[in-house]
Amino acid sequence: SYKLLGKVLQEAKRLNVSVALNPSFKHLSEGRRELIKSLKDISFLVVNEGEAATLTGISFKKEAAVFKRLDSLMPGIVAVTSGAKGVTVSDGRFVYKAGIFPEKNMVDRTGAGDAFGSGFVAGLLRTEEVCREKGTCDPKNIEYAIRLASANATANVERLGATEGLLTRSSFDTSKRFRVMKIT
């Protein structure tokens, strides 16, 4: 519930803890206004194109306007996934765009967005990136998080089920396949 989310965010703020949020379309459609109010306390937001459009009330065809609106609502990083087209990330100062890693054998897209979101947050945590204010992020850390997230999503769609293909830290670190990704 959004009442509980508000309490969690208050406590996180009191403890100086970063909060990542990946709301579902159902949560967005049921409590858009409440969620918008909560964004001021969110450090990392991960949504897909449709969720970003629902949240902002702006068609994702106007991508720059969507990011401008989201950046104005929250202090942290916004990542908008675009399925097989990749991701766009804004830290309020820079916008990063990346495609996906080539899939060896796509089996099941279930959980790909969640795999991306968890990989993205893991990448930020691993680099100790906080980004509590717009424009304070280290671009190298954002790019690392995008690469880890994309690798995690790619590995996940190559296995059946939502979690079977998730990468371990070791499998990401040792895989030559995921070392280079074009990020503009």
Where are these regions (language model features)?
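Ribokinase/PfkB-type carbohydrate-kinase core domain
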Residues: S1-F44, E49-K97, E128-E129, C137, ...
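Short, small-residue alpha-helix embedded
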Residues: A53-T56, V107-C137
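Conserved short C-terminal alpha-helix that flanks the catalytic cleft of nucleotide-sugar-dependent
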Residues: N156-V157
